[in-house]
């Protein structure tokens, strides 16, 4: 984004991006088969067939009035159940990685890493659906929106009041995830654009593991 990791709220913001992107992947089926059953039904059917997903991404965060606050780019990887990785390459090298138990936030330039328990960080969030933590329809109100900009759009509003975001809008291009907008309760809007995606490809065994390099300051509970 870039993802500053010195303070808790910044880590929380990075986690929120991960949570909503995971949910976006689960809406492929609704975009592939518009008008078939309901969006929630299609999402749950699709989960059985989703093993891995990856894509290049660009990300911007604005103040809700069009003023860009931060921008970044990199590649995103997902492997069910419960693993994901954000490799930020612009404007600096940073990493957000979940190995199924912990989530790591690593900033190469700052030589700093923050590690958190995955269950407590992602509980009752979109990402909890990765490990079967509830159905889409019980956690979100989902509706199809009119096509716009050549994309098929869906809107998700959380049913719980204690979430960090107000709504998510997700756009698909011929069944492939292409764009996502997230409005949080602070008024900021995050936009993610995905390109060069790959579904159910085999990843290297060590893609979702992280060991802090020598000299890196580790904040939080180190699983080692």
Regions found by a protein language model. Give the residues of each.
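N-terminal leader/targeting segments and the immediate start of mature chains
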Residues: 2, 28, 33-69, 212-224
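Bacterial N-terminal signal peptides that target proteins for export
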Residues: 5-22
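Short, solvent-exposed helix-to-loop capping segments enriched in aromatics
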Residues: 47, 122-137
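Extended beta-sheet lipid-handling architectures
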Residues: 55-57, 71-73, 86, 165, ...
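A generic structural motif
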Residues: 58-62, 87-89, 106-108, 157-159, ...
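Amphipathic hydrophobic-ligand
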Residues: 68-75, 187
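An acidic-aromatic
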Residues: 75-124, 190-191
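Gly/Pro-enriched, hydrophobic low-complexity segments
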Residues: 114, 138-141, 145-224
């Amino acid at each position: 984004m870039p993802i500053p990791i010195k303070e808790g709220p910044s880590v929380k913001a990075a986690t929120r991006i991960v949570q909503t992107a995971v949910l976006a992947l689960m809406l492929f089926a609704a975009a592939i088969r518009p008008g078939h059953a309901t969006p929630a039904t299609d999402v749950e059917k699709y989960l059985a067939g989703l093993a891995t997903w990856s894509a290049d991404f660009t990300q911007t965060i604005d103040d809700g009035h069009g003023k860009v606050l931060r921008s970044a780019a990199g590649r995103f990887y997902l492997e069910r159940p419960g693993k994901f990785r954000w490799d930020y390459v612009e404007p600096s090298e940073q990493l957000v990685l979940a190995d199924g138990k912990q989530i790591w936030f690593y900033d190469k330039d700052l030589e700093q890493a923050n590690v958190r328990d995955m269950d407590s960080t992602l509980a009752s969030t979109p990402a909890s659906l990765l490990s079967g933590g509830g159905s889409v329809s019980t956690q979100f109100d989902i509706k199809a929106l009119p096509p716009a900009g050549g994309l098929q759009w869906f809107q998700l509003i959380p049913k719980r009041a204690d979430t960090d975001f107000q709504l998510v809008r997700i756009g698909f291009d011929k069944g492939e995830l292409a764009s996502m907008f997230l409005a949080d309760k602070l008024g900021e809007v995050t936009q993610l654009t995905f390109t060069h995606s790959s579904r159910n490809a085999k990843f290297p065994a060590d893609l979702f593991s992280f060991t802090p390099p020598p000299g890196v300051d580790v904040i939080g509970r180190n699983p080692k």
